Amino acid sequence: MPAAIEQKSSEGEDARQQVRAQISTFGEEFASIGVQLGARYDGSPIIAADGAPPADDYVRYTPSSIPGGRMPHFWMDGGRGYGSSLFDRMGFCFTLLRLGGKAADTGAIEQAARARNVPLEVLDIPHFDARDLYERDLVLVRPDQYVAWRGNAPPPDPDRLLAQIVGAT
């Protein structure tokens, strides 16, 4: 640390500027939320591809429900404590989110999951803000909290979709 850093003088200002410049070189080392939360499975055969993912940015994270990426965070019920995060309500299995208050008939995909012994929970999220964030009425999330599929209606062939996302094809 420069000795003059605390001085109220031009030497002190120069010392502070020198330290600022040195600290700024570490920005990407510490400000890497884009790397941490923006990791994706693009091109994976166990993801039902849908659209182009957000551009890679090592510093900034852009929440997106495009399959292959980590599911976006959403605060439930206006809370900030345990149980108020959507992540807190996810199980250790595949989870089908029904978003925005539309109770789509998910019986066919639930039946296909039972037939394949794929653990699946259906979670109703009536918040329209969540629907806006996820951009679809239905989102299928893997146990590792990555989006596997999304749509505005149940998949036309749920057995085929499940076979794909569990690697059975």
Regions found by a protein language model. Give the residues of each.
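Helical substrate-recognition/capping region of FAD-dependent monooxygenase/halogenase enzymes
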Residues: 1-169
